[in-house]
């Protein structure tokens, strides 16, 4: 009981620190401007990208164009993530999802699953486009990022509640031990990793770049590995 509690405390503290770092990064980079709720009318709104249509963490109305102060709402490179058409039906969200999609001025997606869901629900053959992370590329940032001062390491990039299966963990540990690598998790907390490190979104790229290899089960983990030519 105490061990379980201490793990939860460490994870909670890690996520508190993570929020502080991300909030500071947003301010420094000028990412967050005025909130849309301050406006009564806007010429257009662009939603996306990433898992804006995913329902596994609960539906967010504004991601579907609801309650936005504009008649022109576009979705770029949206994604349903792990959500399937069966999930939508099981959660009784079919009318919610269909209504949001039909009211969008135009939309595009980044993957086949999302394309197929939309085609089935509203009959649109939407375009599959590149995720902005791939389009941007971070070429300038990668040239100026300092090298990670760290023993040779295997990088794990998975959400907190993922990649904790005993068989998976044992296989990753065995692979790392055989190659003399530490196991490092930047951005998410896994108590079985040797190190859990909090970094801002750009510094995160340097951890991918300097890793001996990467183990990930996420879209952006794969994309960042491709951008820096990391071994997957």
Predicted regions and their residues:
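Aromatic- and Gly/Pro-rich donor/ligand-binding loops
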Residues: 1-99, 145-149
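An anion/phosphate-binding loop that grips the pyrophosphate of nucleotide cofactors and donors
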Residues: 42, 104, 211
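Catalytic donor nucleotide-activated moiety binding site of glycosyltransferases and closely related
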Residues: 75-82, 115-118, 158-201
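A conserved, positively charged/aromatic
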Residues: 98-102, 208
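A short beta-strand/loop micro-motif in the catalytic core of glycosyltransferases
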Residues: 104-111, 215
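Donor nucleotide-activated moiety binding/catalytic core segment of transferases
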Residues: 126-134, 138, 188-223
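Conserved donor-binding/catalytic core segment of Leloir-type glycosyltransferases
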Residues: 147-160
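Structural loop-to-beta junction motif characteristic of Rossmann-like glycosyltransferase folds
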Residues: 229-232
